[in-house]
């Protein structure tokens, strides 16, 4: 699973998440409410509408924001940084100091003070791509970090669903994979996602093992200690502490985590 893994490193104090293999995938499906507006604090492609007062570009409205984030989620690396905000009327009241802090945030991977702004009422700050050890991870702030782990739940469930859809040919001369129609797998339960959240404080890697070790009626992920290093190759499995096994049972349609 050299290039097929998920890396997560969270800071429980600042609610910042550094991830590889998740990023903005399923963000708009996971959050309870899609943001009203986005302020683009780093915008190399000049996307959105230009605001004369703050000199930033913005994206307005739930549907426009949803389309923007979903499009960004499909990029391998994202160079646009953004922060959400509730009301344009409060956005227009930003002080020079607050605008300076937003400019600083756009040029760095860390806020000058906090990644929250009272006048914006933001729930998220998307820092874009960072490169620890030359690996393109995504860094993001969540007011409620459980929003990220709901995203992770969708990523894990989709991985299992896609694996079930791919029916390998029984004979070598049949090289074409047959795609089956299967029901979408549910995401793991809240207690399991909360447990993964706690483990991620130390940095974790999640690998997909499929049915190799558990039989045809189950699919397995393994969770390893990774600390602050997103690099992970097959040989690292013998070197890293195994936190546990996350399995999905096709018969009962349930998830289970065993340490």
Positions of PLM-derived features:
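Structured alpha/beta or helical-core interaction and ligand-binding surfaces enriched in interleaved
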Residues: 1-259
